[in-house]
Amino acid sequence: MPKFFCDYCDVYLTHDSMSVRKAHNSGRNHLRNVVEYYQQIGQEKAQSVIDSITSSYAAEGQAVPNPAMVPPGAYPPPFGFPGQFPPPPFGIPPPGPGGAAMPPPPGARNLPFPPPFPPSSGPMGAPPGAGPAGLPTPPNMPPNMATPPGSAPPPGQFPPPPGGFPIPPPNFQGGFPPMPGAPGQGPAGFSPSPGPGLSGPPGGGSGPDAPGGFAPPPGMGPGGFSGPPPALGDKR
């Protein structure tokens, strides 16, 4: 029958039974030998354990460099988003032809982008002369007037002149009134009488009864010039 050997006490037990082993392990001598054994192992291997821990920390420090030891001019390693996956190793590609735009991370708010600018001309399918966003031309207004200032004219029309006066359409009847204060012109619809030595308008006479002419005002002579009023005339 094999015997049980106690490594702490360095002795063989008389019987290899559970009752004998329990009685030996609870003895005073066995407990003292166990404490001394572990104390001896700790004193001998304390320095080796310290060296192994130091070397393991040094190996981890080489894999992940200290941010304080980064040389000047170098970029620090990118950090991941909080509570999400780490960023790609080559960074986020910029949007455009070189790389597609990446969607925002989950849980992040949408960035406020500026709204698109409205088109300068009317949309496709709008009638000619329509304003921006397909507004119709107001009634009784020339087509050129519907175009707002600063925008391109509709197809088939000329841009307005720089002075600001629109060009009348081909079927526009009548002309523009003369500029006020122009020399040699009177009010609209008034034809001045010819001066002395000048012939009257074609088809009209100089007298009051001439067809197509105008009668001179009271007190005006036949030559077109009137004398002084009776109260201011010279005494003869």
Curated annotation (Swiss-Prot):
GO terms for cellular component: commitment complex; U1 snRNP; U2-type prespliceosome. Residues 80-236 are annotated as: Disordered. Signal peptide: none annotated. Residues 80-181, 227-236 have a biased composition (Pro residues). GO terms for biological process: mRNA 5'-splice site recognition; spliceosomal snRNP assembly. Keywords: Metal-binding, Nucleus, Ribonucleoprotein, RNA-binding, Zinc, Zinc-finger. InterPro entries: Matrin/U1-C_Znf_C2H2 (IPR000690), Matrin/U1-like-C_Znf_C2H2 (IPR003604), U1-CZ_Znf_C2H2 (IPR013085), U1_snRNP-C (IPR017340), Znf_C2H2_sf (IPR036236). Its main location: nucleus. It comes from the Eukaryota. A zinc finger (Matrin-type) spans 4-36. GO terms for molecular function: mRNA binding; pre-mRNA 5'-splice site binding; U1 snRNA binding; zinc ion binding. It is found in: Nucleus. HAMAP family: U1_C. Belongs to the U1 small nuclear ribonucleoprotein C family. Component of the spliceosomal U1 snRNP, which is essential for recognition of the pre-mRNA 5' splice-site and the subsequent assembly of the spliceosome. U1-C is directly involved in initial 5' splice-site recognition for both constitutive and regulated alternative splicing. The interaction with the 5' splice-site seems to precede base-pairing between the pre-mRNA and the U1 snRNA. Stimulates commitment or early (E) complex formation by stabilizing the base pairing of the 5' end of the U1 snRNA and the 5' splice-site region. This is U1 small nuclear ribonucleoprotein C.
